[in-house]
Amino acid sequence: MGIKKMFKKKDPTEGEIRDELTQIGVTTKSDNKTRQEKFGAFKNYAQDRQNAKPGFQPVNPYANVNAGNGNGNPYAQQEAGGDGDGEAMGGNNSSPYDKTTNPYGSRSERANNPYGNGNVGASSRGERAGGRNTQTNPYGGARASGRASGSKPNPYGGVQNDGALADDTESINTAVTGYADPYGNETARASRQSTRRPRAYDEESLDLNAIPSHQAYTPSKPIKRTQMRDDETLDLNDLPEEEDLNLDVDELPEQEQVDSEDDEVEAIKQDIRFIKQESVGSTRNTLRMAQEADASATNTLGMMGSQSERLYNAESNLLLADTQSKIADQKVKDLKRYNRSIFVPAYGNPFNKKSRLRQQEMQIKADKAQEKYLRDTNRKEMYASEQRIKQGISQNATSSDVHQKYRSERDLEAAQRYQFENDSEDDEMEKELANNLDQIGLYSKKLQSSAKTMGNEVDSQNKRLGQIEEDADRLDINVHMNSARLNNIR
């Protein structure tokens, strides 16, 4: 056995196979000639973002507020078994916000209202471990229980409240207000309606979607001003003179007309300034969002460039695998011929040896030319994709300083048509407004160009993916056929 192993032919190594293929002119994969990635930073950024641990990502602390792990609302209504904070020795540490009831609830909920009518027996804060000292509500009605043992009498309980014997309207109004009149029947008879506004009124009067109006938008009318002379005395009982709303501006005195016109001019100036400031703020926000969109588009283009590089690597590997598959096919045919019977000669016809050699050379040339053509085609597609993405990324959304100076002067001249008593601040706002609008327009053009570049790149990569799919299917079939031929060799 040892001698047999000694003379057994060893399997060739990968380096020996590669050297042999290189000698016969077959292209092999070289680890030293790796193509430098120009969009590798985008690929690394995407991989780091995908492989980021959940602990490093921002966590919302309010995500599980309603979970059943005890992190619920501490002020929610709970059905505690104690009497609130009135028990000093009972050991019940219930929340002071428990058993909260709606004071505006229905009539069935009036028993839970601590400030309801006098029929409610509230637990006292003076309750101890020995017994219950019930203390009534000092602001309750005349029918509040003041005769319990140890209880303090109501100082207003002597007056009998006959309002409880009135109709249901008074009792409902008393329940809505949340407390009875402590001064007895006289006040109850005087006012039978609640002074509290219903909830529907508050909901109708409060509009959360209403836009707050600015004082500059409030139209100012000419106001008739009365100036007090030095010899006049101040009479506190004197009624102010009524304003005549039908009075025309032309009928006012000259000084008052001048004052009203000055007020109107000042209000118009304030309106212009306020609207201009709002416009500048809007353009700033729009420019910021345009810059964010441009950064997102640049990142997307970079990711597509990295994807194009990986597609090129896949195409090169498939081309190399196809070449190796053809060589394997030829080797399988030779092995099948050598494995024939000893009675059938393995060598061919000696009379057509030259023609066979010439045919093999032509086949090698054709395979090499086809391989070179496919490699050049893949390289051209990769170069075109790289140039498209570089052009989309390197587009500049800003202009030169000379162009900016020329544009600012032209914008100031154009703004003179609708400016009114402008100062340096107005000129600066006009410059910023015009500059922001120009930048927004340039960013819009760049985004449009980036979108077109993305569309063209996506179409090109889709075609390349289709070609890769076809090559992979053909390679799979060839490998499967070679495996079947090897299995059939006996």
Swiss-Prot record:
Biased region (Acidic residues) positions are 232-244
List each copy of the t-SNARE coiled-coil homology domain by range: 273-335, 427-489
Family affiliation: Belongs to the SNAP-25 family.
The reply to whether Coiled coil figures as a keyword in the UniProt entry is: yes
The GO terms this record gives for MF are:
SNAP receptor activity; syntaxin binding
Q: Name the Gene Ontology biological process terms.
A: exocytosis; protein transport; vesicle fusion
Q: Which UniProt keywords apply?
A: Coiled coil, Protein transport, Repeat, Transport
Question: Where does the record place Basic and acidic residues bias?
Answer: 9-21, 30-40
Question: Which intervals carry biased composition (Polar residues)?
Answer: 94-105, 392-401
Which organism's genome codes for this protein?
A: Debaryomyces hansenii (strain ATCC 36239 / CBS 767 / BCRC 21394 / JCM 1990 / NBRC 0083 / IGC 2968)
Which residues lie in Low complexity bias regions?
58-80, 140-151
Key word Coiled coil present in the record? yes
This one is known as: Protein transport protein SEC9
Kindly state one GO CC term assigned in the UniProt record: SNARE complex
Region annotation (Disordered) ranges: 1-244, 389-410
Which SUPFAM superfamilies does UniProt cross-reference here? SNARE fusion complex
Q: List, alphabetically, the InterPro entries matched.
A: T_SNARE_dom
